[in-house]
């Protein structure tokens, strides 16, 4: 490991620049060498960052020791315990090195230890043998802290545009991202930004610490806004204004929710008001319909023209039966019951022979001859002189034209049946010989005779 101790002599209140060469001493790995490494402090303290400057110009005057105690009260005791042996080793070794590059690298690593020494005032008093060296170390630690926090604020602005989760873990990400090249670049930035009064540095440090000490915010986005607003410019003494975004957001949401609730309640009231008259109307309509249904049977008046002779409950079409059928039914009932005297005076065109009376004959003699052959005059009833009421609508016999059509249809049916009998083999893909002639002969036999 490379170790060094930086000393600066102050004469007549004016700081002087002195470059002292340090020797590179390789030590075996011990408990103290492990503690001196930067990775160890990055793992133990997540807020710890690598040094920002390799070369420091000691231009700031001495700072009182009272302010140092106020700054870091909340520092972890773990860092204090591990820093005490480290500082005692580095204070005792004031050897000189001959190469400037090793001096810059050793200075960058030793500044982290000196910064932690300034954070723990108790350890500084116990282990520092030279009071001037202690004061210079505290000044260096303060300046380093200021530049580190400014760098953090700048990187927080860059990370906030990319991802809000980087803002919450900005400190831990930054500890692993800075390398040897970052140390050299930050040394140049530190020389430019270091030209300022010590009071400005102390004011900035206090403001930043107050912002960080006031507790972790509930969300990652408000923390990004605080880091952006709290990063001061050069020479600015204005207090950082912290915008408390999460306090205003729920208030706005509550007002919107209240407005929505009011609108919903108004709509519900209006719907209830509109539903009540609608229900009343429906009830009135139901009452009217029930009253009309009750009044309908009383409104029906019997028709004087229609006389219902026979009514059946199951047959609703019985009331619409024509009068001719009604009379026929009534006559049949009267005849079966023996009430036939009322029909004696009436004249009937039909006779008792049924449909044979309607057949077309050339003269009356042919008709009588036909009826006698059919046995129409046998077993005549005693009331032959008057016609029977059953022949009121007799079934009519076929006329001459209808008889001819019926004869023709019967002949066609017979011929079709005969053709089916002799063409049994006929079907799809089979046809009989057209010249074949069939003869009916009783003497013909199907056996073949062989003549010798």
From Swiss-Prot:
Entry keyword set: Isopeptide bond, Methylation, Nucleus, Phosphoprotein, Ubl conjugation
Localization per Swiss-Prot or TrEMBL: Nucleus, Nucleolus
Compositional bias per record (Basic residues), positions renumbered to this chain: 65-75, 140-151, 258-267
Glycyl lysine isopeptide (Lys-Gly) (interchain with G-Cter in SUMO2) cross-link, renumbered residues: 7, 126, 280, 313, 347, 367, 369, 401, 436
PANTHER family recorded: ARGININE_SERINE-RICH COILED-COIL PROTEIN 2, LYSINE-RICH NUCLEOLAR PROTEIN 1
Region span, Interaction with ZNF106: 300-452
Chain segments carrying region Disordered: 1-28, 55-161, 184-305
Comp. bias (Basic and acidic residues): 78-98, 127-139
Residues annotated with Phosphothreonine modification: 304
Species name: Bos taurus (Bovine)
Full protein name: Lysine-rich nucleolar protein 1
């Amino acid at each position: 490991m490379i170790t060094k101790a930086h000393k600066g002599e102050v004469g007549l209140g004016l700081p002087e620049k002195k470059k002292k060469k340090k020797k590179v001493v390789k030590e075996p790995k011990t408990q103290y060498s492990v503690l001196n490494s930067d990775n160890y402090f990055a793992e133990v303290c997540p807020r710890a960052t690598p040094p920002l400057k390799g070369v420091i110009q000691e231009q700031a005057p001495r700072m009182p020791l009272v302010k140092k105690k106020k700054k870091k009260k909340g520092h972890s005791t773990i860092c204090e315990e591990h820093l005490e042996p480290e500082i005692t080793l580095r204070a005792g070794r004031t050897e000189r090195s001959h190469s400037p590059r090793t001096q810059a690298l050793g200075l960058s690593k030793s500044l982290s230890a000196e910064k932690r020494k300034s954070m723990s005032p108790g350890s500084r008093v116990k282990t520092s043998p030279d009071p001037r060296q202690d004061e210079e170390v505290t000044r260096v630690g303060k300046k380093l802290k200021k530049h580190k926090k400014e760098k953090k604020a700048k990187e927080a602005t860059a990370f906030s545009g990319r991802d809000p989760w980087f803002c919450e873990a900005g400190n831990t990400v930054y500890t692993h991202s800075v390398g040897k090249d970052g140390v050299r670049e930050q040394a140049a930035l530190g020389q430019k930004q270091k030209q300022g009064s010590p009071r400005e540095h102390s004011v900035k440090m206090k403001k930043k610490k107050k912002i960080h000490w006031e507790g972790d915010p509930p969300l990652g986005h408000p923390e990004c806004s605080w880091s952006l607003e709290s990063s001061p410019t050069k020479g600015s003494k204005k207090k950082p204004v912290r915008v408390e975004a999460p306090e205003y957001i729920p208030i706005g949401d509550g007002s919107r929710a209240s407005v929505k609730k009011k609108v919903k309640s108004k709509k519900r009231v209006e719907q209830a008001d509109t539903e009540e008259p609608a229900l009343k109307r429906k009830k009135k309509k139901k009452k009217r319909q029930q009253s009309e249904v009750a009044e309908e049977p009383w409104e029906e008046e019997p028709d004087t023209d229609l006389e219902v002779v026979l009514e059946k409950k199951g047959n609703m079409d019985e009331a619409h039966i024509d009068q001719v059928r009604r009379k026929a039914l009534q006559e049949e009932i009267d005849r079966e019951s023996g009430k036939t005297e009322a029909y004696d005076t009436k004249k009937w065109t039909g006779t008792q022979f049924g449909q044979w009376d309607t057949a077309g004959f050339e003269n009356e003699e042919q008709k009588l001859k036909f009826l006698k052959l059919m046995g129409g005059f046998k077993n005549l009833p005693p009331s032959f002189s008057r016609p029977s009421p059953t022949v009121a609508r007799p079934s009519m016999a076929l006329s001459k034209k209808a008889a001819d059509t019926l004869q023709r249809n019967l002949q066609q049916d017979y011929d079709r049946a005969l053709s089916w009998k002799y063409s049994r083999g006929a079907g799809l893909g089979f046809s009989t010989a057209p010249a074949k002639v069939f003869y009916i002969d009783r003497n013909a036999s199907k056996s073949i005779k062989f003549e010798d």
